[in-house]
């Protein structure tokens, strides 16, 4: 990504990444559609009642893996291949540690987590079985996300998509087999999702071993190195925490919504599935912008960093406007993919949420790109703070207004968080670019003086 038209390169990189994100969300959407249509609205509520804690835990895993890929992209752009390989190995060790710790903790604390979320009694058992299986599958989630992050860091976003596509097809059949044939209910949906995730991760590993000589580790690369661990943690942990901090606000939001009853839990679950699916293009272009800027930082090309930010925001805002219009006018129709026509109250509430969200969807085009570029330039702490502002905004709306305005307050919690975070991260991103530009100019001046 250090040569050629920035917009063209970013779109080429983002497209397979987008398809991969869509397929990853398809896992969840297929689960929800089959559960909602076959098992009913309460079963759908069971699957969705813990979505915020899944976002917190799995978001931390995915964010950490994405962060671990940033130094890899930087050293790949700087053509320091041996150092890049050192970081790949040390990142893998950190991922293994995270997988063991999170799987053990989350599985043991699952009942307490559901109590904190105020899960209604009539859906508790199904929610518990679904969430526990998802937690037990954390190692597979980390396996796929770390390997796909490494492949993307060296410019290959196509391969992870291909393997994810294959596993997505399998996920459909596993869903139907586990739920319809084996009668495993909500637990069957979780088993199908985790199995598909495991297959995509294993396929990525086989591809790297057989085809990606660039990523093969030599004996000297397979040692734990303090400087590598330190830099990886400095990038990965803040990025993971960024997702988790945002998720804490979502947990407060979901807990407040759960108290409104199973009808609104079903409506919220339905709206969240649609939201997560339509957010995939934002995530794809933001990740593309981050990798683009990180590689060009390593290559010392500050002008291309600025162009990368402009291109990313332009594409993101443009998509946000189009998607927002769709949510405003087609929310009710989209909700019917998950809930039958007879669940009128659920459909109306879901459509209301999507309609309110649609008016502010454009802001995500700025927020996600600016945050990921800030992270890609190495200022992960500042990117994390944008997540803190989101958490605070959601918490204030839910704790301060749900008691008075009910579900209407829930409908405006996300938008308040997005606007608040954007007001912080966009000027911060511009500051980070200016600082990076000065740093690169200083390095170039020292090199010229030395020569």
Locations of regions flagged by a protein language model:
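Short alpha-helical transmembrane segments in multi-pass integral membrane proteins
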Residues: 1-14, 72-137, 181-237, 293-360, ...
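Residue-level hotspots within pore-lining transmembrane alpha-helices
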Residues: 19, 23, 27, 57, ...
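Small-residue-rich hydrophobic transmembrane alpha-helices
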Residues: 44-104, 141-160, 267-331, 364-386
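Transmembrane helical elements of multi-pass membrane transporters/channels
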Residues: 12-31, 133, 167, 196-200, ...
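N-terminal transmembrane alpha-helices
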Residues: 2-39, 52-67, 71, 96-103, ...
């Amino acid at each position: 990504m250090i040569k050629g038209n920035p917009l063209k390169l970013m779109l080429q990189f983002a497209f397979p990444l987008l398809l991969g994100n869509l397929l990853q969300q398809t896992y969840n959407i297929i689960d929800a559609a089959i559960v909602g249509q076959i098992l009913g609205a309460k079963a759908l509520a069971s699957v969705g009642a813990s979505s915020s804690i899944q976002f917190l835990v799995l978001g931390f895993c995915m964010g950490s893996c994405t962060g671990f890929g940033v130094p890899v992209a930087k050293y790949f752009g700087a053509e320091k291949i041996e150092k890049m390989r050192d970081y790949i190995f040390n990142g893998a060790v950190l991922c293994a540690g995270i997988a063991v710790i999170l799987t053990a903790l989350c599985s043991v604390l699952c009942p307490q987590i559901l109590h904190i979320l105020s899960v209604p009694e009539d859906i508790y058992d199904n929610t518990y079985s679904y969430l526990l299986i998802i937690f037990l599958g954390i190692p597979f989630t980390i396996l796929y996300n770390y390997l796909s992050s490494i492949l993307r860091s060296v410019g290959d976003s196509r391969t992870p998509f291909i393997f994810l596509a294959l596993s997505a097809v399998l996920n459909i059949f596993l869903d139907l087999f586990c739920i319809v044939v084996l009668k495993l209910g909500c637990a069957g949906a979780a088993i199908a999702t985790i199995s598909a995730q495991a297959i995509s991760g294993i396929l990525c590993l086989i591809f790297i071993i057989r085809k990606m000589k660039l990523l093969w580790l030599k004996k000297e690369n397979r040692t734990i190195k303090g400087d590598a661990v330190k830099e990886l943690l400095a990038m990965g942990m803040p990025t993971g925490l960024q997702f988790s901090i945002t998720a804490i606000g979502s947990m407060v939001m979901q807990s407040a919504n759960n108290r409104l009853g199973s009808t609104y839990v079903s409506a919220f679950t339905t709206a969240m599935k649609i939201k997560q699916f339509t957010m995939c293009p934002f995530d794809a272009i933001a990740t593309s912008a981050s990798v683009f800027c990180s590689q060009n930082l390593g290559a010392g090309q500050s002008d291309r960093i600025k162009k990368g930010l402009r291109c990313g925001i332009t594409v993101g805002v443009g998509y946000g406007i189009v998607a927002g219009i769709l949510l405003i006018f087609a929310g009710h129709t989209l909700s019917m993919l998950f809930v039958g026509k007879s669940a009128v109250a659920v459909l109306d509430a879901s459509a209301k949420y999507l309609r309110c969200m649609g008016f502010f969807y454009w802001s995500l085009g700025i927020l996600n790109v600016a945050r990921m570029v800030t992270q890609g330039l190495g200022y992960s702490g500042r990117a994390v703070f944008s997540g803190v502002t989101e958490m605070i905004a959601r918490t204030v709306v839910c704790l301060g207004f749900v008691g008075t305005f009910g579900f209407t307050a829930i409908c405006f919690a996300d938008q308040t968080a997005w606007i608040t975070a954007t007001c912080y991260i966009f000027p911060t991103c511009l500051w980070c670019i200016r600082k990076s530009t000065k740093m690169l100019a200083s390095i170039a001046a020292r090199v010229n003086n030395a020569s």
